[in-house]
Amino acid sequence: MKLKLSLCLVSAAMLMISCSRPGIVANSTVTIQSPLKSVSIASYSDTSSFSTVSDPRFLQICFDTVLVVQQTVHTEDDWHFKAFSTVTSDSLGSFFLNGRGPGEKSSPHMEKTHSGDNCLGIVENGTGSLSVVDIKASLQSDFNPVHLETCTLPSGVISSASLGDSSDFLVRLEGETLHYDAVSKDGRTTMTFNPFRKVNAQKSITQLSSILMSNEKCAIVAEVMLFLPQINFYDVASGKIKTTAVDKAAFDWRPVMENMIGPETVQYYQYAAYSPDYIFAVYCKSTLAGRMSGNAQTAIHVFNWEGDFLYDFKVNESLSDITYDARSKILYAINRADSRIIRYELSEYL
């Protein structure tokens, strides 16, 4: 088995070297990779699991045993977030009513984290207000949210990821430039990147849309791009950038940046999740019109934090958001067809 794996890795390395060329990221080459393994996997679910969720939008595992679901809200009496046990599927409580009063949120979104993290960052869109909620402590108080920290993100910040207790990774638009900065809690910039200097970021800000995820253990931030088939890895310690792509369309980035987003624009990645060992990304390679029709098939791509493309999981469903439980090795996903939360058992592979 070890010999076969070694041969496979060597073959993959040879392929990567032959397919490396400059791309959109400055001072970095794009490496086209094929997966080490392509596998079809089946989902499982039951009708009673998470039945109280109304139109789930986003998912996040916290504290290893809690699934937090952000649902669509319609009235001021609706909760934005509901929490469930991943062991029993029982409801654990709800938090943040829809509204603008004390303890309420009007347009929140969850920051990505890994399943072992006790805390969940929730950003209020429009104001940049960041609330860090201690999920473990909130459980012990009947889900009256326990805030560890409430702050406002700096002006111009459009995306962020935590690098632990000491620093954050901030993406900030300043004029025509996107700055990617590691910033300590006392406000010092400890590392900065300017990856998209070939592009007028102000004009192409939508085309540069991405999902940020961070691994404080290895001080790497992964950026899953939506309109290019690639993931950028920012090494905060060394200042180096590595880019892994899954399709040669990554080389043809100029038309993507220059053309307006429209129904025929191709979107490659849609949603993502991570653990300290793996990155999971929902891959569709479909026009926006095809995706909105619900006919676009999706796959789940799995990478390690070194940027190696490990698995291409073929699924029967068209998926939206995902989250991964590293303890049980179960991937949770939202099935776009019926808005139900489904699961994939991955312990055989990871």
Predicted regions and their residues:
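Beta-strand-rich domains and repeat architectures in extracellular enzymes and scaffolds
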Residues: 45-80, 278-287
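A short helix->beta-strand "capping" segment at the edge of beta-propeller domains
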Residues: 28-55, 305-308
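C-terminal motif of bacterial Sec signal peptides marking the signal peptidase cleavage site
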Residues: 15-18
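Repeated scaffold domains used in trafficking and secretory/extracellular systems
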Residues: 53-60, 104-112, 153-164, 204-212, ...
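Loop/turn-rich, solvent-exposed surfaces of beta-rich toroidal or solenoidal domains
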Residues: 261-302
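Blade-loop segments of beta-propeller domains
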Residues: 90-125, 149, 199-203, 316-320
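Beta-propeller blade signature
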Residues: 81-86, 181-185, 295-308
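Conserved blade-ending motifs and adjacent loop-strand segments that build the rim/top face
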Residues: 51-52, 101-104, 250-258, 305-326
